[in-house]
Amino acid sequence: MKLVDKNDKILKTVCDEHILSEDSEKLSYDMIIAMKEHDAIGLAAPQIGENTSLMVIGHEDTGFVVCINPTWEIAEDSKDEEFLEGCVSFPDLELTITRPNSIIGTFTNLEGVRKSSTFMGVWAQAFQHECDHLNGVTFDTL
């Protein structure tokens, strides 16, 4: 699956709320395939040209989490931590970004259930990075 160019205006656009539909599962599946093709641990819908608030994080070894209309807040025990981040939209760029290392992510799953889960370390980083994409923020501007 082709990703949008790093200069595509959709990467600077706040995404529309995702309305769960029959197409949600196919979109999620396509995004997981794209993640595998690009060896990524996260992908947001705008990175494939879709203006909708849906992201996927995970890996074949850990499983994938589809997050619809996600939000996050800092967990009580969180500390700011520097992470070396990459992004499939910026394939030749890695930056050190400071982010909370423990968050509570809230999202709707493909069954329409609103859930909250704790994400730590690299998974907290990935959740925040993909949420940034859904809010029109790319890591090169942080």
Enumerate the language-model features and the residues they cover:
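Positively charged
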Residues: 1-142
